[in-house]
């Protein structure tokens, strides 16, 4: 599944998630709004719905103009802007909830998924089969892990290079989380 290409032309993403692009670009907020506008997302409303492909086109331009580290920052902002189930109180529940939140914040067709697997008491795996870029998903997972990290533990998130990668034409990317 290629990066930056929606799985269905009818998929939409909620505006509060789109606004993560603006928040993730920090001092370059105006550039983010300009890029979004150029791709058909003018003055996004947190409660509005926008075609996912327009948002992905904006991501691609940000990647090409500003760099992949900005996509990571945008991913890190998602937990601050997206709707998540209220009962999350541990790193395991937080990581497992990414798929639920992903489906709450998208509608209109096939969107892909985030598959969570607990590998041990302090380890987990997430397989991300969606059209978002690797760096974005890495930032999203890092943010969720840090937000719900156990006291005295520092989470680590790595892209599993032994597994397929969307950037290299794979259908998914795999991330390993330890804490």
Functional labels for PLM-detected ranges:
Residues 1-65:
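N-terminal leader/assembly segments
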Residues 135-150:
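Short, non-transmembrane amphipathic alpha-helical segments
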Residues 40-135:
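Amphipathic interaction/junction segments at domain boundaries or subunit interfaces
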Residues 21-22, 75, 95-98, 157-158, ...:
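Generic hydrophobic, helix-prone segments enriched in Leu/Val/Ile
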